């Protein structure tokens, strides 16, 4: 590959737009695909994505299009940044058109419902024998496009993928770390969305710093417990894609999932909240999926269970909190295996 690569970013939401803008600013031939033709033409003409990132000028080198085939033609890197619910459909549509030697990257943080597959596993099914990577970490799109100092993780079993993605994305304000635990990095990004809803609820109820610290720590314990049972490396959850992403998402109202939790904590219904927020909050779907998997595997996840009771079983938040606080008290840390 030469220094200047051809990169396609599929998905014109906030994160897809932000990373496409970085790549274009780095001097690569960058194409941002949006599903809606009118939106794509408007963003291309106005040099702004007013629906998701209003007020931020897009790099002049960024080409915005609704032509999926043209966007990936001769691409060195194809990045999928679409919601998890439409991920497989987009992967299947684009599969025949991805160049043979292209690297395919997922930035989507979610889990497919019935299969419990992560996005890179869907890519393996739909695309066959391609080099795959996952980009994940504590990354708000708004701060990326503002050129705030940001760190992220590229995870792949292929050194060539890691090196290429670092070359494509890295800038003076965007630092890319490496990890070979693709499954763990991706699982961390999906699971933390659940706990952002929990901490948002706690904030709405007026809980203080003691509560926040307890929730963050116990959330990390639950994430790690499930992830290691599924085969991930527990050490991954001590890095940017684990505890880093958890802290960011659980402490800021820039997080859609945190805002969902906050609104529910203030008494709004789930349907009302999702309608008002106007964007996908992956954590809501992930709660159901993870609850079912934890029950199936016999994994102790009391925060997931409690949140499921509030969101989908009609239980009162304070009743659930009381149950969590008065339940059996386990050890804080297993000295052989980490946080319990």
UniProtKB/Swiss-Prot annotation:
Record bears the keyword Calcium: no
Binding locations of sn-glycerol 3-phosphate: 109, 137, 192, 245, 255-257
Catalytic site positions: 192
GO cellular component, one term: cytosol
Statement: the UniProt record of this protein carries the keyword NAD: yes
SUPFAM superfamilies xrefs: 6-phosphogluconate dehydrogenase C-terminal domain-like, NAD(P)-binding Rossmann-fold domains
Alphabetized InterPro entries for the sequence: 6-PGluconate_DH-like_C_sf, 6PGD_dom2, G3P_DH_NAD-dep, G3P_DH_NAD-dep_C, G3P_DH_NAD-dep_N, NAD(P)-bd_dom_sf
Entry protein name: Glycerol-3-phosphate dehydrogenase [NAD(P)+]
Family assignment from sequence similarity: Belongs to the NAD-dependent glycerol-3-phosphate dehydrogenase family.
Pathway entry: Membrane lipid metabolism; glycerophospholipid metabolism
Residues binding NADPH, per UniProt: 14-15, 35, 109, 141, 256, 280, 282
Signal sequence extent: none
């Amino acid at each position: 590959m030469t220094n200047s690569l051809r990169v396609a970013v599929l998905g014109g939401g906030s994160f897809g737009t932000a990373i496409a803008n970085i790549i274009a600013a780095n001097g690569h031939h960058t194409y941002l695909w949006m599903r809606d033709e009118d939106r794509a033409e408007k963003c291309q003409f106005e040099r702004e994505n007013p629906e998701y990132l209003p007020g931020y000028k897009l790099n002049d080198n960024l080409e915005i299009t609704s032509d999926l085939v043209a966007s990936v033609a001769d691409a060195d890197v194809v990045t999928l940044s679409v919601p998890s619910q439409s991920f497989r459909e987009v992967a299947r549509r684009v599969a025949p058109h991805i160049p043979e030697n292209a690297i395919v990257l997922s930035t989507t943080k979610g889990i497919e419902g019935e299969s419990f597959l992560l996005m890179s596993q869907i890519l393996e099914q739909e695309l066959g024998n391609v080099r795959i990577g996952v980009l994940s970490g504590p990354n708000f799109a708004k701060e990326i496009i503002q050129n705030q100092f940001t760190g992220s993780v590229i995870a792949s079993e292929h050194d060539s993928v890691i090196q290429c993605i670092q070359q494509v994305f890295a800038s003076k304000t965007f630092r890319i770390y490496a990890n070979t635990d693709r499954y763990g990095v991706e699982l961390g990004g999906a699971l933390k969305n659940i706990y952002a809803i929990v901490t948002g609820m706690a904030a709405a109820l007026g809980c203080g710093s003691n509560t926040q610290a307890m929730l963050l720590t116990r959330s990390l314990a639950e994430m790690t417990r499930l992830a290691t049972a599924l085969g991930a490396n527990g050490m991954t959850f001590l890095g940017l894609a684990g505890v880093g992403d958890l802290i960011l998402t659980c402490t800021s109202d820039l997080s859609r999932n945190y805002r969902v939790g906050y609104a529910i904590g203030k008494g709004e219904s789930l349907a009302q909240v999702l309608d008002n927020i106007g964007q996908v909050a992956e954590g809501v779907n992930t709660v159901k999926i993870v609850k079912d998997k934890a029950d199936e595997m016999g994994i102790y996840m009391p925060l997931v269970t409690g949140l499921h009771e509030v969101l989908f079983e009609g239980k009162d938040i304070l009743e659930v909190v009381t149950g969590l606080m008065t339940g059996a008290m386990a050890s804080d840390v297993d000295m052989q295996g980490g946080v319990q």
